Amino acid sequence: MFGARCLLRALRSCSSAPCPRHKPSAKLSVRDALGAQNASGERVKVQGWVRSVRSQKEVLFLHVNDGSSLESLQVVADSNCDSRELAFGSSVEVQGQLVKSLSKKQNVELKAEKIEVVGSCDPKDFPFKYKERPTLEYLRQFPHLRCRTNVLGSILRVRSEATAAIHSFFKDSGFVHIHTPIITSNDCEGAGELFQVEPPSKGKVPEENFFDVPAFLTVSGQLHLEVMSGAFTQVFTFGPTFRAENSQSRRHLAEFYMVEAEISFIESLQDLMQVMEGLFKSAAAAVLSSCPEDVALCHRVLAPGQKDRLEHMLKNNFLIISYTEAVEILQQASQNFTFTPEWGADLHTEHEKYLVKHCGNIPVFVVNYPLALKPFYMRDNEDGPQHTVAAVDLLVPGVGELFGGSLREERYHFLEQRLARSGLTEAYQWYLDLRRFGSVPHGGFGMGFERYLQCILGIDNIKDVIPFPRFTHSCLL
């Protein structure tokens, strides 16, 4: 099989001939080795982990993976090679010649001259077995090891590529990247679900608080981006956010990543929605182009049919309905909801999923929410009798709410009244100052990055698209 006798003769002829002085082997990633156009015996060094070992009478076959690609590199060695520690999961360094493969399953293979086991792995104790496909739920028990499986490797490569694609979208669109703080004295969402930051021993700090004011882990970088939007017309941030929500649902984490943007000199939600839709489609297209094998594995193994669902989302223009229209659609539905839809009440997950299905499983923007439902910074539409603000949520298949955004209230007196009614005037005097000194119409949005990955990959549980999930009663590692 695979021309084993020919390979054996080649290996032995190499070992029996006088050993010439070789130049040092070039270190190559598995991805680069597999993509080599000229596999003409170049001496290379590949490092990685063994995914499979197969011993024949005269030839030993290994598959080595270093995380750079889904596909592994086939290594061919003389069967006399000491293979006692070559097991699934062991780490190796292989030096040899990169040659064209005789197999139709791969273009190139590595003809080994030297195999060094860097770290052994006892397959009896290793929680994952060769050729087994453990469930994502099972893998969550091993946050320190699950990245070594094919499916988690693919998810994390997609995550990496999506991160790069999002940065590229904003850079190409002229946005300035801002590092917003992790520790803050602001509660942007006003929900009170914050993690407070304190030193381990308050007695070591003479003041009442370490920072002289209560400090928290950020729930959003929006307010800091609004500061920056007074000097830069387009800004964005991409970083961790924290919510002390007592939830173990498939859609919530205590620590997750948010993509947030603020744009100055815009006066309509349409302008904002255009950027949101562009970001969604641009990043998805980049991921499909840069790691198609990884996306295909997730779709095939975890979400059959997701490929077609994603293509459907990308080729259609996103729809737009008002909050009022959404409530009317829900009230006319034959489905029995746990939460009765009524004007003035928030939309729940069951409502969001129904609306997406009603719209043909195309992402849909819901605009103009009741003023009473939204935070103080959203722009008053001055409408009646149903008083609304210029807010927008993007609902997507399988997830529900993915984006949330609004035009910001740039008018000083409107904002002053909203803050006064909420008892926040003193705490947000600095925010009012932004409206006193060169205020402009502006708006922004936030996108939950993990939910975005769930949407494009079709993964049901948010805990499976982040390397180290943190949620109620769980902070492993």
Predicted features by range, described:
Residues 1-477:
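Class II aminoacyl-tRNA synthetase catalytic cores and aaRS-like
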